[in-house]
């Protein structure tokens, strides 16, 4: 498999509450082995913490790791300006249906959602939707109106609930390639 490295020096991964979140520690480990010089910051929703240990991510990632809650003392103050350290890109990996709908509505009721709403940096959404309908598709199209938003390329995956094959955007190599393309094209929210 030909996988391209992220062409920046720092990125932020926002982990949301899908069962796919259980695989994120492995992907963070893979990313750090594949590109050890890359600084990886991570935010984790409280729902995602049901599927992974934030403490493990603090050992695997080499940037800031925090829980997406106003009560977490580790939330960096720069989230108020759409930043996370010097991150040049944001990945929502995995992106649950609830998270994507909240982003499309402009909600900013958690530190990470506020950061993602305010950022001008490329934002790649690696969705793990259980299904779709007109409302979901309309909200996806609303997000695609933002010049700095793109969805990760879809790949075949297996649903946890029934083991059937389904197309999902939970694709870190594809998300990194999309981020590189967006950066080359100068796609930001400005």
Swiss-Prot record:
Enzyme Commission no: 1.3.99.36
User: The organism sits in which domain of life?
Assistant: Bacteria
Which keywords, in A-to-Z order, does the entry hold?
Answer: Decarboxylase, Lyase, Oxidoreductase
Quote the catalytic activity from the record: [cypemycin](1-18)-L-Cys-L-Leu-L-Val-L-Cys + A = C(3,19),S(21)-[cypemycin](1-18)-L-Ala-L-Leu-N-thioethenyl-L-valinamide + hydrogen sulfide + AH2 + CO2
NCBIfam families xrefs: RiPP_decarbCypD (NF033753)
Which family does the record assign? Belongs to the HFCD (homooligomeric flavin containing Cys decarboxylase) superfamily.
User: Function of this protein?
Assistant: Involved in the biosynthesis of the lanaridin cypemycin.
Q: What is this protein called?
A: Cypemycin cysteine dehydrogenase (decarboxylating)
């Amino acid at each position: 498999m030909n996988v391209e490295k992220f062409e920046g020096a720092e990125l932020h991964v926002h982990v949301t509450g899908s069962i796919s979140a259980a695989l994120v520690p492995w992907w963070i480990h893979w990313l750090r082995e594949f590109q050890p010089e890359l600084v990886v910051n991570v935010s984790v929703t409280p729902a995602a913490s049901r599927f992974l240990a934030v403490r493990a991510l603090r050992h695997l990632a080499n940037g800031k790791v925090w829980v997406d809650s106003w009560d977490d003392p580790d939330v960096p103050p720069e989230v108020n300006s759409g930043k996370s350290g010097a991150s040049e890109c944001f990945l929502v990996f995995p992106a649950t249906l609830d998270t994507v709908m909240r982003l499309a509505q402009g909600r900013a009721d958690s530190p990470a959602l506020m950061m993602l709403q305010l950022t001008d940096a490329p934002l790649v959404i690696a969705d793990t939707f259980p299904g779709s309908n007109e409302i979901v598709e309309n909200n996806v199209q609303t997000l695609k109106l933002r010049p700095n938003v793109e969805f990760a390329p879809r790949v075949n995956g297996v649903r946890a609930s029934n083991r059937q094959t389904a197309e999902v955007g939970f694709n870190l190599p594809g998300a990194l390639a999309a981020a590189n393309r967006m950066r080359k094209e100068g796609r930001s929210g400005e």
